[in-house]
């Protein structure tokens, strides 16, 4: 892996010039988890949270988060996303909820940051909608799981782990 790309020779932050890169299909998948009390999990699972459909609202928030990534992360390029898909998986064993976001574009730079932002915003929305009953929820294990396209090629977390 090469050096940090967001700094020039003098050490000043700058937005990377992607003008000379080829446009290709870019895909990134990110995942994260929010752990909670069993009673909080039951409220979400049973659709009985006072604020409404927790996972439905969190899905919309995650999609919006992906779309607004360049507004939140200073050196991210604004991208025309072609797809944002967000899924939630209830996990009785934690108890908690896993969020998986897949983001796609046809462009000159990857969408890893958009996928990560989608997951974080989705999980933050779950926290916001349930914090009245459980302030101890923990957002954890947010990571890129897969990346496809671009000059550096395809990558998966499983392959990287060996």
From Swiss-Prot:
Keywords: Lyase, Molybdenum cofactor biosynthesis
Pathway: Cofactor biosynthesis; molybdopterin biosynthesis
Tree of life domain: Bacteria
Keyword presence, Lipid metabolism: no
GO BP terms in the entry: Mo-molybdopterin cofactor biosynthetic process
Residues reported in the UniProt entry to bind substrate: 75-77, 113-114
Entry keyword annotation includes Lyase: yes
Gene3D superfamilies reported for this sequence: Molybdopterin cofactor biosynthesis C (MoaC) domain (3.30.70.640)
Active site: 128
InterPro entries: MoaC, MoaC_bact/euk, MoaC_sf, MoCo_biosynth_MoaA/MoaC, Mopterin_CF_biosynth-C_dom
Catalytic activity: (8S)-3',8-cyclo-7,8-dihydroguanosine 5'-triphosphate = cyclic pyranopterin phosphate + diphosphate
A GO molecular-function annotation: cyclic pyranopterin monophosphate synthase activity
E.C. no: 4.6.1.17
Assigned protein family: Belongs to the MoaC family.
NCBIfam families cross-referenced by the UniProt entry: moaC, PRK09364.1
Its job: Catalyzes the conversion of (8S)-3',8-cyclo-7,8-dihydroguanosine 5'-triphosphate to cyclic pyranopterin monophosphate (cPMP).
Subunit structure: Homohexamer; trimer of dimers.
Name of the protein described by the UniProt record: Cyclic pyranopterin monophosphate synthase
Organism of origin: Burkholderia vietnamiensis (strain G4 / LMG 22486) (Burkholderia cepacia (strain R1808))
Phylogenetic classification of the source organism: Bacteria, Pseudomonadati, Pseudomonadota, Betaproteobacteria, Burkholderiales
